[in-house]
Amino acid sequence: VAVAAAAWRLFGPPYTPRFRPPQSHPWRLRGTTVFVGDREFLVRQTGPVDAEPIVLVHGLGGSSVGEWYRVGPLLADDHRVVLVDHRNHGLSARTTEPFEIADLADDLAGVLRALDLEPATVVGYSMGGAVAQELAHRHPWAVRRLVLIGTFATHPPRVRRIRQIITGMIRAWERLTGVGTPESRALYLRWTGAVDARHWRWLWEETHRRDPDAGAASSWALLRFDSTPWVGRLAVPALVVIPARDQLVPPPWQYALASHLPDVELVELPDARHEAPWTHPETIATAIGEFVKRR
């Protein structure tokens, strides 16, 4: 059986699910590229060019359009919405070299400076929330306001060790089989109904723009992230949006982050899980828009 499975993996066609009903792309937003040093980053923009910018920062394993295609259009009537793919994500540059979340923040700061977009309201989801915190810490000129969704300041030590082991096992499995995180991510979002059946092919293709080593480098950077020594000194207004049923970033971690921030407002999404940007776009967009008006 093992030999047959290996032969099929080597010589058989790649697995692709059946896509029904007729398929479409959910948000056909044209992108351009910006160089920061020698690295090239994909940037997409929409909304009035003279409006205040809102930068939507995506999470681990996704892409800017892949995670914000439901929230972004709801903000674009009144704001200049900016989306950037991180290194190793979406259509931006790849690297297997080790890096830190601080490096992703430096990348984003370089993009904002190149496009003359600072200061901006920076909205970070999941890993993007860690990047947004580092951006406000390392490049305070770039951030007018922070919105943090489904994110944290640090991992508890025991959880960090467990997730580091799991990350190594996932990387090994993906190297051996070619199957892993993209498939599980796409299937989960489809199974929960977070992504409409019409966009299933797009989701499948979007999640497969990665490789095991690049994905692991991003995962390990996130596991090393710890903002607790300095997050309490961030001198910007912050909104923390907490999915109350978050299965990946436990809500107590999110409340702990909020407790460190000196100027913070809270919004709780009572029935939301970690995939809140897909399932609760109207609530999130409204919270962001009202926060920008108030602060």
What are the language-model segments listed below?
Residues 1-54, 78-79, 118, 293-295:
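Alpha/beta-hydrolase fold catalytic core
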